[in-house]
Curated annotation (Swiss-Prot):
GO annotations of cellular component type: chloroplast; ribonucleoprotein complex; ribosome
Organism: Oedogonium cardiacum
Protein known as: Large ribosomal subunit protein bL20c
Family: Belongs to the bacterial ribosomal protein bL20 family.
Major localization listed first in the record, in broad terms: plastid
Keyword Isomerase listed: no
Disulfide bonds: none
Gene of this entry: rpl20
Amino acid sequence: MTRVKRGIIARKRRQKILNMNKGFRGAASVLFRTANQRYMKSLRSAYENRHNKKRNFRKLWISRLNSAVRLNGLNYSQFVYMLKKSGIILNRKILSQLSICDPQIFHELYSYIASKNLI
């Protein structure tokens, strides 16, 4: 069997990982083994945080809505219940943006819901 020299291939593979780790601190950007571990961990963290971002934004929208609705004397869960009862289909993102950017329209929406549900 003939001998296969993999020097160039192995070097390219290692160099690819090290190039990905530019900007990492300490040995994570210099030593291959440490760099490879940090690179794998960064991919894992990126995957987790892409999914956590959705959760965090939903939490933010709900807390913004809750604070806006409490100014009118309701809480978030009652507000969402009345929205569904009224047949208004607006998601939490749009509602929270309305409450921040255009409070007047948000108040009109609230009064419309209140009149429909007879608070």
